[in-house]
From Swiss-Prot:
Complex and partners: Heterotetramer consisting of two non-identical subunits: a beta subunit (TrpG) and a large alpha subunit (TrpE).
UniProt organism field: Buchnera aphidicola subsp. Tetraneura caerulescens
One MF annotation (Gene Ontology) recorded for this entry: metal ion binding
Enzyme class: lyase
Pfam families on file: Anth_synt_I_N (PF04715), Chorismate_bind (PF00425)
Protein's gene: trpE
A biological process term (GO) from this entry: L-tryptophan biosynthetic process
Cofactor binding comment, as recorded: Binds 1 Mg(2+) ion per subunit.
Protein name per the record: Anthranilate synthase component 1
Regulation of its activity: Feedback inhibited by tryptophan.
Binding positions for Mg(2+) per the UniProt entry: 374, 510
InterPro entries per UniProt: ADC_synthase, Anth_synth_I-like, Anth_synth_I_N, Anth_synth_I_TrpE, Chorismate_C
Amino acid sequence: MYYRSIKSEIIQTICTYHEEPSLIFNKICRTKTETLLLESATVHGKKNIESMLIIDTAIKISCFKNIVEIEAISNNGLFLLNTIDLKILKKKSTKIKKKKSNVLEIHFPIFNYFTDEDKKLFLTSVFDALRIIKKSIKNPEKSKMGVFFGGILSYDLISSFEPIPRVFNSKYNHPDFCFYLSENLLIFDHKKKKCKLQTNIFTDNEEEKLNILKRIKIIYNQIKEINSKKKNNRINTFNDFKTKNKKWVDCKNDSKVYKNKVKKMKQMILNGEVFQIVISRKFFLPCPYPLESYIFLKKNNPSPYMFFMQDRHFVLFGASPESSLKFSSITRKIEIHPIAGTRPRAFSSIKKIDINEDNKMELAMRINSKELAEHCMLVDLARNDLSRICLPGSRVVSDLMKVVKYSHVMHLVSKVEGVLRNDLDIFHAYQCCMNMGTLTGAPKIRAMQIIAEEGEIRECYGGAIGYFTGKGDLDTCIVIRSAYVRNGIACVQAGAGIVLDSIADEENEECKNKAMAVINAINKTL
């Protein structure tokens, strides 16, 4: 298919390295929306690996059911919005409306759920909006990744592709997906202690190009100033806040209600409805300082995936241990990392890890038949998901049941990978694999239908956050161990996988243990 090409000029500026990108976020983006910080760290050494910070967004792409809204955030983005050729979409039974001078709305046809599984991947869908924008931008050959899109894919997006009832119990209209196309992106390589600013220029207006160059200089100087005044650039971190008013409120699913739900799910399993299902609890608490809470969470619970997304309507932050979907455009290798099997860490009376008791916890998890059966079931589910999109014979389980330990819990982790078919892209892959079995259950579709029948909207929880690039790479994590903040109130959601052998008290405690790292981080800033 032909896409009219829009040339992207990329300027890379070497900036002064800083070991703590959240300080730069605080300095440059504290009051800016449509900003995003993505980070990764080693679990045991607590060492930063890489950070990527969208300082300025060119365009924002949001999806609400079958409507995709493309909004130009900058003049540079407005040029891109007015240049993208959307005629291809008009041929696919879509309607395009100009909502404002800087906002386009694309109305997609209702998806036909009951088509053949392979044909379903090629039906017109809301992913075509992301696909066309990505393919319309010509990336410089010398650029390693090309343009950069960062954002979220909500759990409830699945209702646009599968016969899963939509839940409407929230007064807020949360997007099914929301991505920012970066205009100014800071990239930190913490191993090499290097930092560079990547600027994307789409406009051909010389005056606007000069404005962008001025913006580069401002950002460069702001970063330099932070580094020259490290001692005086501390954020009001957790130590500066009173912690007397610690409180968290359980919404709807208190312990008694949750245990009853576990019993109900076990009966459905016994009736043959599902083999396993993930039901969750929501905890609400005040969160007036989400950035400070994120910093505390990052310090005490370093994870492979950490994120702080600041939208005009919400803030989402977290430290997730679990990859959602990862794809390399060079090798075409696609990966899923199922996590199932959880035990709390063992602490001594002085709140330090008791190594002897911790090892006993690990052994108990490794030999627990319920945990092993649940994990194998989800590894098999990941294999099935990849079999639909990978080349025959390329799918393998490269890691099986490794133990990974975090601040409050330990998990069993596996890795399933394969080679993506040549006729498919990252959007086909995500469409086929969402939502991950570790947050839904098995069989996946029926499990999600039952979760929807519970009448509790999940929004971000159980969805994915991460990025994709102009060159076609994708790296996302599952949104867990996170807080979704609106109007100063955080919602922390955590779930447990229910099987026939589940014990209600243990599953209830597992939810609390999983939520505790985030709740503690927020409480430290109250």
